């Protein structure tokens, strides 16, 4: 099936590619070629059995093109060049297969005891669902089991993770167990950091990286196996990937899919893939004593850092062992860490969240002579295993991406976690022996919480998904095989936003079969090629129209990452003074341009350590600054591929002090470009108050760190 759809002139029978009868009328034998042209092309097709599946597609298409060549001399030259390419492809596949290491398995992991059963089930089924408790070893051992099942030859083993930190950690662990250098037979790929090469057989990556590859490899021919790890997280990427694989598998019968989950209803996933077999693998969990210590007990309400310190005192009296604290976000984690360091000097206190540098993240997994307290987001729930943990303190909250149906704004509020998440958190202290988990909320509160976390697809803005699906001719989200369908209202809102951005031709949700590339405008197709949110992509394109493309890229990139400017609660005045040199009173947008200009110069002239110190002294987050600069370069590469002119605003250098001009004209083109992506986020001041009235009667205020906080203009545009 796969062969006939991919190679029009060939049928795939097992590992053999043979000519279809009547496929491509053979020309008369060329007397200068012993055996004639038909024999030559048959031999070329046979050689495709010894190249990778992805190379097979490209080379088979090339063979078809050469067969249509009527001039003998041109055909002979093309065949010679093709034979050279096949030679290269054969050697490349041979090198990768030769580099596959001998797999060994840690005997203490529960999954090792089920290795043979898993191997046979994966080999004999196209889809397998594995319900593996945290600590079972599923993330690190499944890729090796796939290798031992004979997979990972014609294509590689792709292993997706929902977070960059987990992709790096899992990849490094697999490489270590196989005694390999990361980036060889085992590699990882995350945004701005690719550690793979042509010998890589196991590729651990974020699900976003795999989805991005669909643009140039829609049939995922580069892969023999796709392992979708941590499916219980039900992120938008995971749900989209599972739906895409559901559609892909009938035309890729040689592709294997393994879906792993810790808490999700695995029967639902198995049913999604037409009754795929389910294998349950237990973890290494000991009994956990769960204690409820609400923050408002005993007639007083403690803030979170104080409640955490109280619980640390209780656990310290229980005996030795490291403590893992779950909090909601980066700022909350840093507040807890600072409070604990002040009052618990004997502990080594370490934060853990996705935006930490790789070096800082690795500190959590290294050895320490002191007792540790690790304060983490939900990244340590299932994605990562923090070693040495005997105790857990759970704040019971997490930041959840949520789209407001009323204001049409995507928010990141702090919300109570589900029962499944709370149980995952408490289970992290039962891997080495009996553990204790303290929950900083009431037991009645726990009982009232939902059993599972609501899938992201049911609580997020779908404009980006709708745009991607239309660009890849996947139809309407309402007809796509998602495990849980999106809210029709969210689909309508997403389509209306795309119409506002001039990305689609109609504000109405398209009927079946009409949500394809023809529904997109030229602007929509261009936005779809940019690796950012559609609103930000529209800003970039408007920057090109306004003659300030590079400034628009800088601004869009800054809005795509977390704001690098820090304003700690206890040091707000000092932070404001440090930020003053790059503040532009006219707008936060122009302030960002000043910051980029100042920081980019320092980044070129200072080494990494010096630049980090320069950022810290100015209340700038060095890691976020680096991510901002990396995103700028990624967008510059994208617009160059699109053939856009790398234009600069004529006022840009002037506004930075290199000349003189009418200040009233500075930045108008830049502001117009930003407005193109933020049309529905304009606000009018309500009387002389601090409030602004936006679309759909949404009311909001300017945050104190904004340059507009003091001036309070009559109209503002909020990004």
Language-model regions: role of each:
Residues 3-539:
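P-loop NTPase motor module signature
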Residues 345-346, 351, 393, 401, ...:
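Second RecA-like catalytic domain
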């Amino acid at each position: 099936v796969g062969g006939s759809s991919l190679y029009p002139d060939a049928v795939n029978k097992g590992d053999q590619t043979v000519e279809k009868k009547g496929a491509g009328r053979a020309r008369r034998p060329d007397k200068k070629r012993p055996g004639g042209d038909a024999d030559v092309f048959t031999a070329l097709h046979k050689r495709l059995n010894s190249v990778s599946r992805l190379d097979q597609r490209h080379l088979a298409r090339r063979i078809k093109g050469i067969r249509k060549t009527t001039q003998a001399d041109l055909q002979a030259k093309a065949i010679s060049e093709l034979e050279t390419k096949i030679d290269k492809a054969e050697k490349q596949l041979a090198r990768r297969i030769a580099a596959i290491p001998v797999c060994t398995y840690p005997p203490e992991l529960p999954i090792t005891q089920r290795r043979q059963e898993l191997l046979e089930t994966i080999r004999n089924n196209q889809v397998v669902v594995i319900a593996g408790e945290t600590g079972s070893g599923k993330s690190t051992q499944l890729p090796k089991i796939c290798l031992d099942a004979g997979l990972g030859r014609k294509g590689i083993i792709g292993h997706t993770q929902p977070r960059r930190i987990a992709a790096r950690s899992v990849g490094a662990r697999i490489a270590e167990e196989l005694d390999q250098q990361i980036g060889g037979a085992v590699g990882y790929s995350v945004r701005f950091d690719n550690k793979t090469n042509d010998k890589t057989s196991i590729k651990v990556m974020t699900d976003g990286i795999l989805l991005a590859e669909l643009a140039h490899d829609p049939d995922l021919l580069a892969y023999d196996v796709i392992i979708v790890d941590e499916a219980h997280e039900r992120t938008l990427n995971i749900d989209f990937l599972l739906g895409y694989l559901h559609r892909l598998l009938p035309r890729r019968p040689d592709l294997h899919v393994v879906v792993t989950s810790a808490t999700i209803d695995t029967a639902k996933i198995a049913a999604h893939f037409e009754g795929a077999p389910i294998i349950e693998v237990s973890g290494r969990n000991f009994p956990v004593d769960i204690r409820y210590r609400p923050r408002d007990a005993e007639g007083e309400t403690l803030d979170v850092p104080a409640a955490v310190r109280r619980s640390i005192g209780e656990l310290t009296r229980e005996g030795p062992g490291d403590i893992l604290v779950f909090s909601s976000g980066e700022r909350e984690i840093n507040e807890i860490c600072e409070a604990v360091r002040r009052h618990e000097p004997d502990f080594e206190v370490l934060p853990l969240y996705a935006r930490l540098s790789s070096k800082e993240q690795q500190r959590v997994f290294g050895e320490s002579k002191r007792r540790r307290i690790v304060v983490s987001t939900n990244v340590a729930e299932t994605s990562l295993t923090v070693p040495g943990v005997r105790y857990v303190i759970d704040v019971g909250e997490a930041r959840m991406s949520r789209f407001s149906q009323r204001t049409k704004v995507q928010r990141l509020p702090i919300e109570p976690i589900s029962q499944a998440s709370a149980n995952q958190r408490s289970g992290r202290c039962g891997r080495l022996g009996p553990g204790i988990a303290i929950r900083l909320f009431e037991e009645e509160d726990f009982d009232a919480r939902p059993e599972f976390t609501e899938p992201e697809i049911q609580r997020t803005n779908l404009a980006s998904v709708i745009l991607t699906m239309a660009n890849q001719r996947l139809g309407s989200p309402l007809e796509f095989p998602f495990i849980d369908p999106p809210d029709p209202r969210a689909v309508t809102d997403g389509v209306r936003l795309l119409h506002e951005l001039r990305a689609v031709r109609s504000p109405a949700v398209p009927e079946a079969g009409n949500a394809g590339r023809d529904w997109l405008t030229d602007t929509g197709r261009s936005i779809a090629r940019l690796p950012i949110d559609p609103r930000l992509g529209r800003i970039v394109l408007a920057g090109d129209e306004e003659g300030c493309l590079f400034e628009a890229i800088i601004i869009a990139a800054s809005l795509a990452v977390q704001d690098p400017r820090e304003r700690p609660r206890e040091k707000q005045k000092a932070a404001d003074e440090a930020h003053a040199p790059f503040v532009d009173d006219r707008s936060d947008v122009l302030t960002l341009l000043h910051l980029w200009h100042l920081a980019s110069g320092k980044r070129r002239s200072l080494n990494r350590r010096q630049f980090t110190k320069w950022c810290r002294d100015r209340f700038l987050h060095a890691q976020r600054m680096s991510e901002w600069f990396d995103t700028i370069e990624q967008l510059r590469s994208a617009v160059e591929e699109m053939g856009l002119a790398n234009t600069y605003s004529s006022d840009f250098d002037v506004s930075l002090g290199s000349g003189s001009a009418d200040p009233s004209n500075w930045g108008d083109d830049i502001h117009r470009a930003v407005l193109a992506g933020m049309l529905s986020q304009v606000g009018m001041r309500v009387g002389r108050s601090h409030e602004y009235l936006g679309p759909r009667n949404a009311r909001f205020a300017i945050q104190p760190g904004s340059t507009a906080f003091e001036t309070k203009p009559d109209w503002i545009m909020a990004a």
